[in-house]
Design a protein with these regions (language model features):
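Nucleotide-activated chemistry modules centered on ATP-dependent adenylation/adenylyltransferase
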Residues: 1-134, 139-445
C-alpha cells in the first residue's frame, strides 16, 4: 500500500512509499458534478474519464488544491457544496498518463496478487478444497474477479453472488454486465428463501451491533450454495474476497489468509488486502475493468440499499439518486421509528442521526417480547409459541435442509444429524432428539 504525491500534470499523482499523503481517494466523474449542479460554477466537458479527485470522500481536489467541499447530508438531506474556486475549467484526466506514472509499481502489485492466488490454489487444491470468488458487484470484488480470472482456469472456481435482495438496482445491472464481460466463468447466485421485507418485519432493522442481516441473507445462503455446488455437507472451500485493510480499523487487523474466520471449513484469501483506493482505481481504470455506475455518482460504497454501517454521505446519494431501490427498506426504518413513539416532526432527524442504528433486542417491534418457551421431556425438545406470524416450514430451512415431509411431520438435517419434526397447533413445535445420536448418512443432501 503506497501513498501518493501530486505531479504538475492535470490530475496525475505518483504512488510512492515515501509520500506524505495517504488519504482515501476516488475519481470524480461528470455524473457526480451534474448531480450537485457544479456546472453553474465550473466548465467541464461531457466525458467518461475522471475530471478531478475527491480526498476523504467529500473534498474535491485538483492536483492537491481543495476546490470544493461537501458538508452534511442524510437520507432526506442533500449535501451542501461549498465552492472554493469558481470559474474553474476542468479537462479530462488522461488514464494513459496516470498509468505511465505508476505502471512499474502497479504491475508489481498485480503480479504479487496473481502469484498469491496461484500459490493458495495449489496448496488447498491438494487438500481437496473447492474454490469460490465472493462477488458483490462492487469495485473490490470486480478487481478480485479480474485477478482470479487471470490467475486460474475458469473451470477451477465458481463466482458466487450473494444476492441479499437488498442491493441497489444498479448493482444488479452490474452483475448482469459481469456475466457478459466474463462469459466463460461459472456464475452462481446464493439467496435466502426469505424475502428481505419479511425478515425486516420479523427481526426489525439491523443495527450496528445487531447485524442479523449478514447471517440471514448472506453467510448462511452462501454456505448452502457451496454445499449444493460441491455435494458435500461439510464443504471445504477457499473464498477469494475483496477485503481491504484501508476500509476499517477492524479489517486492518486481518491476515491475507484467514482460516475458519467466517466458517470452520472456510479459508478466506484476500489478494488485495493491502491495496488502497488510489491503487485500485488507477489499475481498474487503465485495464478497463467493469465499474459499477454507482461510483460515477460519488457513491463510495455499494452494498445494501439501507445499511446500519453506511455513512450519511452514502445515505444521501443513494436515496436521492436511487430512491426507488431505497424506498422499501427505508420505509421499514420509518415504521420502526413510529413503533418507537418518535414524534412525527422528529422522525427524519431520528433516522438521519442514527437513532435506529443503535437498536438492540426486540423492544419497539410489533412482534417483540418473549413469545417462546422451551421444554425437554422424554428425548423430545418442544418449543411453544405464544403467537406466530408465519408458517414454521417457511422458516425451518434456515436451520438445515428438510429431507422428508408429510403434512405436519418432517425429517430435517441439522448439523449432520437427522431430527424428526412435528408441528401441532395445541402442543407446539417438537424436535425429537432421540433419533440424532449418529451422523446422518444423508448429510450430503
Amino acid at each position: 500500500m503506497y501513498g501518493y504525491e501530486w505531479t504538475e500534470s492535470n490530475g496525475i499523482f505518483r504512488l510512492t512509499i515515501d509520500a506524505h499523503i495517504e488519504k482515501e481517494i476516488r475519481p470524480v466523474f461528470k455524473e457526480e458534478l451534474d448531480f450537485f449542479g457544479m456546472n453553474a460554477y465550473w466548465d467541464y466537458p461531457d466525458t467518461d474519464n475522471p475530471l478531478l479527485w475527491a480526498e476523504g470522500i467529500r473534498r474535491y481536489v485538483v492536483n492537491g488544491e481543495v476546490v470544493a467541499e461537501a458538508k452534511e447530508g442524510g437520507y432526506y438531506t442533500k449535501p451542501k457544496i461549498k465552492i472554493h474556486r469558481k470559474g474553474l475549467t476542468l479537462t479530462p484526466i488522461s488514464v494513459e498518463d496516470l498509468w505511465k506514472e505508476n505502471a512499474a509499481l502497479l504491475t508489481g502489485m498485480e503480479q504479487r496478487a496473481i502469484t498469491f492466488i496461484q500459490k493458495t490454489y495449489t496448496e488447498y487444491a491438494a487438500k481437496g478444497y473447492s474454490f469460490v470468488v465472493a462477488f458483490s458487484g462492487g469495485k473490490d470484488s470486480l478487481l478480485v474477479l479480474d485477478l482470479v480470472a487471470k490467475a486460474l482456469p475458469p473451470e477451477n472456481f465458481y463466482v458466487v453472488f450473494s444476492n441479499t435482495g437488498m442491493e441497489l438496482d444498479e448493482t444488479l445491472h452490474t452483475i448482469e454486465k459481469a456475466k457478459r464481460h466474463w462469459p466463460n466463468l461459472r456464475f452462481e447466485e446464493a439467496k435466502c428463501h426469505m424475502d428481505p421485507l419479511q425478515s425486516w418485519d420479523e427481526f426489525g432493522p439491523p443495527g450496528r451491533r445487531l447485524r442479523w442481516c449478514c447471517a440471514v441473507h448472506k453467510s448462511v445462503p452462501t454456505i448452502l450454495k457451496l454445499r449444493e455446488l460441491t455435494g458435500q455437507y461439510d464443504v471445504q472451500a477457499v473464498v477469494y474476497d475483496g477485503v481491504r485493510a484501508e476500509e476499517s480499523a477492524r479489517r486492518a487487523k486481518y491476515d491475507e489468509i484467514s482460516v475458519g474466520a467466517k466458517n470452520i471449513n472456510q479459508v478466506n484469501c484476500s489478494p488485495i488486502l493491502k491495496w488502497n483506493t488510489a491503487e485500485l482505481f488507477v489499475y481498474s481504470l487503465y485495464h478497463g475493468i467493469l465499474l459499477n455506475n454507482c461510483y460515477r455518482y460519488g457513491i463510495n460504497r455499494v452494498g445494501c440499499t439501507v445499511c446500519p454501517l453506511s455513512s450519511s454521505w452514502r445515505d444521501s446519494l443513494t436515496n436521492n439518486i436511487y430512491s426507488a431501490s431505497v424506498k422499501p427498506l427505508l420505509t421499514k426504518v420509518e415504521e420502526y421509528a413510529v413503533h418507537q413513539d418518535i414524534p412525527t416532526e422528529r422522525r427524519k432527524k431520528y433516522i438521519e442521526k442514527d437513532g435506529w442504528r443503535t437498536r438492540m433486542g426486540g423492544r419497539g417491534l410489533p412482534n417483540g417480547g418473549n413469545r417462546i418457551t422451551e421444554s425437554v421431556s422424554n428425548d423430545t425438545l418442544t418449543f411453544s409459541f405464544a403467537s406466530h406470524t408465519q408458517n414454521w416450514w417457511d422458516v425451518a430451512p434456515v436451520l438445515g435442509p428438510i429431507i422428508e415431509k408429510n403434512e405436519a411431520r418432517a425429517v430435517q438435517l441439522i448439523d449432520r444429524r437427522e431430527y424428526t419434526v412435528s408441528v401441532d397447533e395445541t402442543t407446539g413445535l417438537l424436535y425429537d432428539v432421540s433419533l440424532c445420536t449418529q451422523p446422518s448418512a444423508r448429510c450430503g443432501q
